[in-house]
Each structure stands twice: as C-alpha cells, then as structure tokens.
Amino acid sequence: MDELHALAEEHEGLLTSKEARSLGIQDSVLVRLAQRGRLERMSRGVYRIAHYPTDRLAQYREAVLWAQASHHGLERIALSHETALLIYGISDLNPSRVHLTVPKSARLRRERPEWITVHQADLTEKEVGQHEGMPVTTVSRSIMDVFSTTHRTDIVRQAITEALRDGLLSSAQATGLRRIIISSTAESLSLSINGSKVTGA
C-alpha cells in the first residue's frame, strides 16, 4: 500500500491500474483494496486513495488519467475547450462536462464517463502547456477550439479580453484572434445569406 500511496501522491491521490502494474501490482489487488475501502474506484482503470483530500482540480486530473489508462501510448492528451478557459480563469462558463482533446488516431477502449466530452485533434507540442501538473491546451488554442465548436462570439471575446488583461495573451496575439473571429463570423454570415431562399417575390 505504501507504493500505491507514493504513486498516488504524484496525482493528488489518484492512480491508474496501468501505473500500478508497472510496480508489479496486479489489477486483482486493486479490486480487493477497493472492496475493503482502502481505494475508491473512480472510473474504469482509475482509483483514488480512500479519504485522500481533494481539490477543485481533482475531476480534471481524473479525466486525464482516464484517457491515459484508456489507450496505450496515447500522447498529447490535453484538457481543452471550455474546461481550459475555466482553468485559466478567463470565462464565466462553468461547464458540467470536462472537455478533453486526444489524437485523431486514438481509439479509446474504455467506457467513457458521462461527464467527459472527448474531442479528437492532433495537437502540436506548442499547443499544449502545463497547469499544476496537468496538460492543458494553450490560451490561443483553447479560444479557437471554443469558437469552432460553439460559434459563441460573446464567450471568446470575453476570454480574449480577460486573457489580455491577465497577461496570458500578448496584444499581437489578441489582435490576431479577434481578426480571425471577425473574418470567420463575416464569412459564415455571407454563406447564410447567399444560401437562403427568397420567397414571396
């Protein structure tokens, strides 16, 4: 159990069955510990040390560990979209689901918890940063992801303004994002108008 405690310390009390196996601890041992109340099974392949203090980021860590446990060798997993904006503190949104981006080639074999939304995209190294030990898409990437999936200009404009205020974006980056959003919005409006039918003429 001491080995599991040491392992879980790296993830604020969380560990995966894959990590335990690397220490020579079989899945059956984890199952028995869970039955005895020493571990809590959070999702398939993810456990928490019982009574371990949790923090506001616990669910995000669990989502990342779930994805890592779901696919061998999965690289460039990152918390993303609305979740990333919330982590950076640049959005008033409080999404009920945790948004996570995994590579397009990923075939997640484990049952997905209903509170996780999985997006698939091939992130570059420069598009992923770290926040309190967790992989998170960069501010710029997160804003564009939210815009591409929601088309909510109010959300992304607020995020850009607050990121600029907090020093998370440079003036040049903020200007570039605003131009992309304005251009995309204008293009969408043009396509909508051109594609509409005129009746009653």
Question: Where would I find each of the regions flagged by the language model?
Answer:
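Short gly/ser-rich loop at a beta-strand->alpha-helix junction or flexible surface loop bordering the NTP-binding
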Residues: 1-138, 145-201
